[in-house]
Amino acid sequence: MPSAPRERFPPSIRFLAWNEAAERFSYYGMTSILTLYLVEHLGQPRNLAISWYSAFAAAVYFMPIVGGIIADRFWGRYHTILWLSFGYVAGHLTIALWESAAGLLVGCTLIAIGSGGIKPNASAFAGDQIPRDRPGLLERLYDLWYWMINVGSLASQFAVPWLYERYGPRVGFGTPAVAMAAALAVFWVGRRRYARPPPTGPSPHGFLRVIGSAVRNVRHAPRGGGWLGGALREHPAWAVEGVRAVFRIS
């Protein structure tokens, strides 16, 4: 007996998946040369360069809280991703064109706001495209999402350091800028195909609520499901998977 045909993703997913790969290329490409740039071109001691990188990474990890609040209460996920992506591109261009400590500070600030603010919304917005009565398709979506993240990040680790060494920081940092501009363009091209849930105010299954639930119920997390599994006692699987995807992106 022939097996049932495999469910297809909605057309919107192809735009979001390639947007994610390009965004991750831009982020990991930029971070792969950040410390080297601080030491070799700005003349910073290595320990100070590492501290700078750590502060930048901390800002990126903090911004998902802000990005989630903005999306839930004000702009919705679509417009949050769209507008923060413009700042993200501007951050890359600032570092590429303004070769100084001040340029790096401004650029890193814009990138932290863009990357961190988009982080909780990109995977959740992709999940918005999948009907809730198709949980198997949602699981496949997050597998695809993780794959696209790996494609973008792995490609950047080879391409960007090589370009930096061969052509200098302007091309090295300019390449992630082009990648992020491409990510924004792909996202915008698919705009008419997206399901766009409006902002609804604080969600009962929001990012912070799921994390808080996971911490409270960590002892009840199913074996092999990671510490976030405890949140399944209070939240649906799609909400927990959305948060899990954020940490995969990090």
What are these language model-derived features?
Residues 1-11, 133, 161-250:
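Intracellular loop-helix junctions on the cytosolic face of multi-pass helical membrane proteins
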Residues 1-27:
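Cytosolic juxtamembrane N-terminal segment immediately preceding the first transmembrane helix
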Residues 117-133:
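Intracellular juxtamembrane helix-capping segments at the cytosolic ends
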Residues 32-52:
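Short amphipathic helix-loop junctions that connect adjacent transmembrane helices
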Residues 73-86, 133, 137-138:
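Cytoplasmic membrane-interface "Motif A"-like loop-to-helix N-cap segments
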Residues 82-106:
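C-terminal ends and interior cores of transmembrane alpha-helices
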Residues 38-39, 70-74, 159-167:
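Interfacial helix-cap and linker-helix signal at transmembrane-aqueous boundaries
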Residues 54-72, 154-156:
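Central cavity-lining transmembrane alpha-helices of secondary-active solute carriers
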